Amino acid sequence: MENNISNVRIHLHRKCDVNEQDIYGKTALHYAYTKRNIDIIKILLKCPGIKICIKDNDDYTPVDLICSTISSYIASSLENKIDEVDKLGETPHYENG
Protein backbone atom coordinates (compact mmCIF):
# COMPACT_ATOMS: atom_id res chain seq x y z
CA MET A 1 0.00 0.00 0.00
CA GLU A 2 2.90 2.36 0.73
CA ASN A 3 3.89 2.03 -2.93
CA ASN A 4 0.42 3.28 -3.97
CA ILE A 5 0.74 6.25 -1.63
CA SER A 6 4.17 7.05 -3.07
CA ASN A 7 2.78 6.88 -6.61
CA VAL A 8 -0.05 9.25 -5.73
CA ARG A 9 2.38 11.70 -4.15
CA ILE A 10 4.64 11.55 -7.22
CA HIS A 11 1.72 12.29 -9.56
CA LEU A 12 0.55 15.16 -7.38
CA HIS A 13 4.07 16.58 -7.18
CA ARG A 14 4.17 16.54 -11.00
CA LYS A 15 1.05 18.71 -10.96
CA CYS A 16 -1.21 16.04 -12.45
CA ASP A 17 -4.87 17.05 -12.56
CA VAL A 18 -6.40 15.45 -9.48
CA ASN A 19 -9.86 15.87 -11.04
CA GLU A 20 -9.00 14.19 -14.35
CA GLN A 21 -11.59 11.63 -15.40
CA ASP A 22 -10.92 8.37 -17.23
CA ILE A 23 -13.14 6.81 -19.91
CA TYR A 24 -15.55 5.73 -17.17
CA GLY A 25 -15.76 9.24 -15.79
CA LYS A 26 -13.96 8.23 -12.61
CA THR A 27 -11.39 10.36 -10.82
CA ALA A 28 -8.60 9.33 -8.48
CA LEU A 29 -11.00 9.93 -5.59
CA HIS A 30 -13.54 7.49 -7.08
CA TYR A 31 -10.84 4.83 -7.29
CA ALA A 32 -9.43 5.53 -3.83
CA TYR A 33 -12.94 5.01 -2.46
CA THR A 34 -13.42 1.81 -4.51
CA LYS A 35 -10.18 0.42 -3.03
CA ARG A 36 -11.24 1.67 0.43
CA ASN A 37 -7.83 3.33 0.70
CA ILE A 38 -8.36 5.85 3.48
CA ASP A 39 -4.76 7.11 3.36
CA ILE A 40 -5.03 8.03 -0.32
CA ILE A 41 -8.48 9.55 0.21
CA LYS A 42 -6.98 11.79 2.92
CA ILE A 43 -4.11 12.82 0.63
CA LEU A 44 -6.47 13.62 -2.25
CA LEU A 45 -8.84 15.61 -0.04
CA LYS A 46 -5.94 17.88 0.97
CA CYS A 47 -5.24 18.78 -2.66
CA PRO A 48 -6.13 22.35 -3.60
CA GLY A 49 -8.91 22.36 -6.15
CA ILE A 50 -10.11 18.81 -5.50
CA LYS A 51 -13.70 18.44 -6.65
CA ILE A 52 -15.61 15.89 -4.60
CA CYS A 53 -18.83 16.06 -6.60
CA ILE A 54 -17.64 15.01 -10.07
CA LYS A 55 -20.04 12.43 -11.48
CA ASP A 56 -18.80 9.29 -13.17
CA ASN A 57 -20.56 7.72 -16.17
CA ASP A 58 -23.02 6.06 -13.77
CA ASP A 59 -23.85 9.47 -12.23
CA TYR A 60 -22.10 8.70 -8.93
CA THR A 61 -19.86 11.17 -7.15
CA PRO A 62 -17.29 10.12 -4.55
CA VAL A 63 -19.56 11.77 -1.98
CA ASP A 64 -22.52 9.63 -3.12
CA LEU A 65 -20.46 6.47 -2.78
CA ILE A 66 -19.05 7.33 0.62
CA CYS A 67 -22.42 8.41 2.04
CA SER A 68 -24.18 5.29 0.78
CA THR A 69 -21.53 3.11 2.42
CA ILE A 70 -21.77 5.02 5.69
CA SER A 71 -25.58 4.78 5.62
CA SER A 72 -25.48 1.05 4.91
CA TYR A 73 -22.89 0.50 7.64
CA ILE A 74 -24.84 2.51 10.21
CA ALA A 75 -28.14 0.83 9.30
CA SER A 76 -26.55 -2.60 9.49
CA SER A 77 -24.94 -1.79 12.83
CA LEU A 78 -28.22 -0.54 14.23
CA GLU A 79 -30.11 -3.54 12.90
CA ASN A 80 -27.69 -5.87 14.67
CA LYS A 81 -28.32 -4.07 17.96
CA ILE A 82 -32.11 -3.93 17.78
CA ASP A 83 -33.97 -6.65 19.61
CA GLU A 84 -37.11 -4.76 20.50
CA VAL A 85 -40.36 -5.54 18.74
CA ASP A 86 -42.86 -2.92 17.69
CA LYS A 87 -46.64 -2.94 18.21
CA LEU A 88 -47.03 -5.43 15.36
CA GLY A 89 -44.49 -7.79 16.86
CA GLU A 90 -41.84 -6.97 14.26
CA THR A 91 -38.29 -5.73 14.62
CA PRO A 92 -37.21 -2.75 12.53
CA HIS A 93 -35.13 -3.64 9.50
CA TYR A 94 -33.25 -1.87 6.77
CA GLU A 95 -34.15 -2.37 3.12
CA ASN A 96 -31.74 -1.50 0.34
CA GLY A 97 -33.02 0.56 -2.53
Swiss-Prot record:
Mind telling me which SUPFAM superfamilies this protein's record contains?
Answer: Ankyrin repeat (SSF48403)
Per its UniProt record, what PROSITE patterns does this chain match? ANK_REP_REGION (PS50297), ANK_REPEAT (PS50088)
Which UniProt keywords are listed? ANK repeat
Q: What is the organism field in this record?
A: Rickettsia bellii (strain RML369-C)
| Name of protein | Putative ankyrin repeat protein RBE_0357
The ANK repeats lie at 24-54
| InterPro entries in the cross-refs | Ankyrin_rpt, Ankyrin_rpt-contain_sf
Q: What is the lineage of its organism?
A: Bacteria, Pseudomonadati, Pseudomonadota, Alphaproteobacteria, Rickettsiales
